[in-house]
């Protein structure tokens, strides 16, 4: 087996289009992702129980899980949101009432700060400041 990841054998998956973010209160979530985080909203269809927010490369599809017949289990693994400066972004969100889990930390290649949306979905402010470690696979299709 190869140590480096590379193109697949032409499988059917091309990319990730959206990540579903469950909520129990769609109006509250729309306010949080739009007003608090400042993400542009592209769709809000209350009668269909969802809204979508855009980042430059991925859509966050906020769904009223229970109204769609799905158990509302928060995303705990985390959704990493790229920012230019974690410290500045954190300070701005703290001014808007966001509470963070612990201090901002440095992994040696990036800075991260963890927080939750009102439903307990973990979000991460993230900024990579160093190249990927040597020996790690390059991301297929990533901009140079």
State where each predicted segment sits.
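Amphipathic alpha-helical segments
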Residues: 25-41
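N-terminal beta-strand motif that seeds the catalytic metal site of vicinal oxygen chelate
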Residues: 1-30, 57, 77-81, 129-144
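Vicinal oxygen chelate
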Residues: 25-27, 79-122, 130
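Conserved short beta-strand elements that form part of the metal-binding/catalytic scaffold
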Residues: 40-74, 122-128
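Loop/turn position at the start of each blade in beta-propeller repeats
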Residues: 14, 48, 108-110
